[in-house]
Curated annotation (Swiss-Prot):
<feature type="transmembrane region" description="Helical">
    <location>
        <begin position="285"/>
        <end position="305"/>
    </location>
</feature>
<feature type="transmembrane region" description="Helical">
    <location>
        <begin position="532"/>
        <end position="552"/>
    </location>
</feature>
<keyword id="KW-1278">Translocase</keyword>
<keyword id="KW-1133">Transmembrane helix</keyword>
<feature type="transmembrane region" description="Helical">
    <location>
        <begin position="620"/>
        <end position="640"/>
    </location>
</feature>
<dbReference type="Pfam" id="PF02687">
    <property type="entry name" value="FtsX"/>
</dbReference>
<dbReference type="GO" id="GO:0005886">
    <property type="term" value="C:plasma membrane"/>
</dbReference>
<protein>
    <recommendedName>
        <fullName>Pyoverdine export ATP-binding/permease protein PvdT</fullName>
        <ecNumber>7.6.2.-</ecNumber>
    </recommendedName>
</protein>
<dbReference type="GO" id="GO:0016887">
    <property type="term" value="F:ATP hydrolysis activity"/>
</dbReference>
<keyword id="KW-0067">ATP-binding</keyword>
<keyword id="KW-0472">Membrane</keyword>
<dbReference type="Pfam" id="PF00005">
    <property type="entry name" value="ABC_tran"/>
</dbReference>
<dbReference type="InterPro" id="IPR027417">
    <property type="entry name" value="P-loop_NTPase"/>
</dbReference>
<feature type="domain" description="ABC transporter">
    <location>
        <begin position="6"/>
        <end position="245"/>
    </location>
</feature>
<keyword id="KW-1003">Cell membrane</keyword>
<dbReference type="InterPro" id="IPR025857">
    <property type="entry name" value="MacB_PCD"/>
</dbReference>
<dbReference type="InterPro" id="IPR017911">
    <property type="entry name" value="MacB-like_ATP-bd"/>
</dbReference>
Amino acid sequence: MQTPLIDLRNIRKSYGGGDSPQVDVLRGIDLSIHAGEFVAIVGASGSGKSTLMNILGCLDRPTSGEYLFAGENVAHLDSDELAWLRREAFGFVFQGYHLIPSASAQENVEMPAIYAGTPTAERHTRAAALLERLGLASRSGNRPHQLSGGQQQRVSIARALMNGGHIILADEPTGALDSHSGAEVMALLDELASQGHVVILITHDREVAARAKRIIEIRDGEIISDTATSDPSVQLSANAGALQAVDLRQRLADGSEPTGAWKGELLEAIQAAWRVMWINRFRTALTLLGIIIGVASVVVMLAVGEGSKRQVMAQMGAFGSNIIYLSGYSPNPRTPEGIVTLDDVAALANLPQVKRIMAVNGAKAGVRFGNADYMSYVGGNDTNFPEIFNWPVAQGSYFSEADESSAAAVAVIGHKVREKLLKDVANPIGQYILIENVPFQVVGVLSEKGASSGDSDSDDRIAVPYSAASIRLFGDHNPQYVAIAAADASRVKQTEQEIDELMLRMHGGKRDFELTNNAAMIQAEARTQNTLSLMLGAIAAISLLVGGIGVMNIMLMTVRERTREIGIRMATGARQRDILRQFLTEAVMLSVVGGLAGIGVALIIGGILILSEVAVAFSLAAVLGAFACALVTGVIFGFMPARKAARLDPVTALTSE
């Protein structure tokens, strides 16, 4: 005797239990179905026929009993193998059609083949042929809402046949149709049965059930009659035993992981994600806004921080990285600072590693020209100033050694002082300004340097001969500090050590002086700027985090709204990982689009800031980093909703509203 294709032994299905009362839906079902049979399972509403169909189609598991498919116990199959069985053996035709609303008729039909790993061209050809066979060739691009009920049911039948549809499970296929459409659907099922497909028809209508060759009546979860209207063997055809002729376990081993399927599934996931995003454009835009703001904030903040850093570094570096500063120092704030003398300067000038040295005696002082008053830094120094600080004169000339020797009342003004006091004077050279009410003649204007660090503006200064500053302005011959240019920029540290040793000898071993160098100051400023940039980036990253929470929120809502779609995908053969991939792809797509848009917005904002003369320096690493963060955010915050979707029970998902 031929082994049944489907063999149910004492199948029971119960719900509830524990704190709630147990409800027995199926009570000891024994049923065998052979290849090629056209079976109708008929019963009133609540009789358990739909539950039986779900178990037959591997959408649900029985509470107890054995389900043998082609001789293999279905209870021993894992979720992926059950998905393979649904994909390769079964084709579902539901009363409610269960088509994915956002997909076209052809895309709905192709879905089982996507999960089977069928090549794209072959998939398109087969789907088109099935739709043409069912009279829907002209409607292949229409979405479900653009089709009539009968047309939607025919699309559902085409989908059931996409992977062969060896076993067609039709649950009330005519229940939502008018009589004409219902007759067309039943004619199709008759045709499929005559071609050797196993057709299992679930219905409450005895007239519809009469079309089958075998009628099984179920009541209160029990089979009360099983009547064959003709010999099932008459219906067998060449392909009727296709599944039975091979070892199911081998088929599962070979086919539960379709070769190359992931490529088609990924492409379909991307296309589906884009469709969903486009259909829900307004909601998508609001979700993207969080990602866009987050990415744009990170990129712009880091660009502003980097621009500020480069500007400050360039301005500080413009003074030379080989400069060492010497000044008086006291370790105890209650005692006066040590004094650096001109004798110290003379001794240091003889060190072989010292290229140039200059004493500076300066302070803030009131400056007047005409009726304009201004406070600026006035520094007494010598003719080494332009060389030590690499600071040429833009107009006029620097004062000479003769001016220094004679304590001449001459001054070289900075660019900012020129703008503040002599802006309306065509040629400031030769003009007289009052410094602390002492007249000084302007002999030169320094070139523009800009801010050296923080709020300090290097152009806000006036240079006068050291002797003139000491005698005419401050009355103190000792320098405020000493600027020393090392002969070798790569040996600044060693030069500083030599200066330190000499000063200790000259001051009797007393460390009442302090040494700093531009290189160390630049490094310290760089660290400060880096910290500032990180702070700005961290603040901006909070926006990105908020955007990620928005993605998770919208994906959780999407999973809830599309629960039935998840059930449809599972019924057509999607594994848990396929569902996970689908919804994770959607989350990542949101992040990718939001990330790219955020970068675009950041570049626009950066352009506006540059036009506003704000220092901005975009970094490829920062841009890519922000985009990567958006991507990771999408993966992290999209994983939980996607995982929730993947863990849904197929039956629960299909019956959700």
